[in-house]
């Protein structure tokens, strides 16, 4: 009585069966399912073992290529997560000894009981290689990594685009990340009745079979349409709970999911469920996605609707449950919009620190749109070129103006909400990605040799666990050439880490120079700062010991603020520095950040070595530093031989080698070659006012910083 549909070409065993309809009518239908799939998983494994072996061989070839670049941190992180674990010879030998010991024990037991069956049940040889059946146990040690994919509006995709998406998903499987796809055929964001209307049911089934057929062409283990895995209960779920999703959608029959995924089959899940009367109902695809997340996270529970066959499978499901690494939403609208970025979208979202602010921004945008005060096209940053392109340039194929209909902000809000709720239930290493189906269909290896290869955001994210573009990079107005009429760039989301800024610019505004009403903070005495942990962070990041007393003496009275990411996984210390030529002069009574007496200086930027290159810690700290704490610019120096200088250069307005070639100065300040207004100088002679520009003050500051390391060696800071 459980429906699933599999294309007959893959030959995983078929059986026809006439069953009563779920609504207890007498109409019968024919359904295709696997023979005893819930218990006889071994036969399925045998039928797909050759395909799995080929996939494993292809993945080993790819990982071998990655291993040829051991200096690449991204490659090492990918191999650490997805490479096939190997059993050591010692473990195999220990297993053989265990089997020998067990055999001797059994012999002694047979003597004590007086039962002697001779050598009939004795193993033949224990001292050679492991027995053939043991090879599969070694294979089972390899975890199944999974990505849940929600595909919105597949009915608007051409067969070619759908095929290219299927190709991408099959390439992800070869790299070690299996997928399960949830279909979302809803045209809008309004709430629908749970009644399944015939035209809607037929449309969803047609689109599901289109996707299954496309996946069959590229994924050798095949694909499967699963329609009976979900149950629905009309219970009131307003009570807060981490175990229940709104809408009462629950995974009821896990044996319809786990074995196919284990064998490399890609299940396509329709947004249908069955209530307590076994009646088919329509449910929201977001609720289906959250129910699957909970099940794969080990938080699912049955309310008695599990079938007897399913209950038999439950005894093994903890062992066979895949590891959910990614939640992916393919939405024609693209990523989460941002009014503060020239490219129009958040490329990386640290949910722990940014979720509430982004949600509030989207809610305000949604209310403006619904009241007619604005339109979704205001998601652009007002770039004149974007407006011209919107009005004068014809949209590219696949870019539809209806993507930015009045419901767009609501849809973005729903995407943000479902990923926040889903990632909250998963380990911190899990991540989410929102992108357009067209981006997912990008071919990394084009059909035409004359076509330039393009990066596929899904494959790039799988290999690097990062967004296509670093969120800390500055964006130019021309980086979003198509204007707001185009879908937003992809958004990468992580559960992330909390971000602490002292003082908090979200409360007090950007950091200000010290004054009687705004005294400088003291790192060692401020109760909000764990100074020993801060010192440990600096020591670990710089790989040398800081001299705490000398350092505190040097920055005393000049600390602008401190940024702390997570539990001191990364951070930045900023100071206000005065050029040596102005020390001792009388400053004006009222000081502003744009003053020759107070140059905003990045004194320490540190990230734990264990967090470098992963988790976005560097990007999180840098974005807070340059966009929130010092939006008007900051200056810093780095030793000329520092390999991080390329990273600094990409995020700065410019760089300059200081005299002596030991240091390189960087800055994010606009107009650094300009001067200051007359009223900002105070008691300084006119000649110095004419001669000193911002440029001279910054060079003076960066050349005069004294290192504060415990080894006493005057080498690079």
Swiss-Prot record:
Its main location: mitochondrion. Residues 1-23 form a transit peptide. Residues 39-50 have a biased composition (Low complexity). Gene3D superfamilies: 3.40.630.30, Acetylglutamate kinase-like (3.40.1160.10). InterPro entries: AceGlu_kinase-like_sf, GlcNAc_Synth_fun, Vertebrate-like_GNAT_dom. This is Amino-acid acetyltransferase, mitochondrial. Residues 35-70 are annotated as: Disordered. One of its GO terms (cellular component) is mitochondrial matrix. Pathway: Amino-acid biosynthesis; L-arginine biosynthesis; N(2)-acetyl-L-ornithine from L-glutamate: step 1/4. It comes from the Eukaryota. GO terms for biological process: L-arginine biosynthetic process; ornithine biosynthetic process. It catalyses: L-glutamate + acetyl-CoA = N-acetyl-L-glutamate + CoA + H(+). The gene is arg2. GO terms for molecular function: L-glutamate N-acetyltransferase activity. Residues 518-691 form the N-acetyltransferase domain. Belongs to the acetyltransferase family. PANTHER family: AMINO-ACID ACETYLTRANSFERASE, MITOCHONDRIAL, N-ACETYLGLUTAMATE SYNTHASE. Residues 51-70 have a biased composition (Basic and acidic residues). Its EC number is 2.3.1.1. N-acetylglutamate synthase involved in arginine biosynthesis. It is an enzyme of class 2 (transferase). Keywords: Acyltransferase, Amino-acid biosynthesis, Mitochondrion, Transferase, Transit peptide. It is found in: Mitochondrion.
